[in-house]
């Protein structure tokens, strides 16, 4: 997961992928979730939602919160 997170970090710094940043945050959130870092997962899902309210991160964030509660 660390390699995936590093690659996503690099892509997020690339301005040429501006239109896909919400998906990159969603994917990075998934990577953090699989790693067990729930705070980073939730933060990344929220970043994705802020960029695109229709992002699949909405459902992922809701499910993560349900699991944690």
For each predicted feature, which ranges?
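Structural marker of alpha-solenoid helical repeat scaffolds
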Residues: 14-17, 50-51
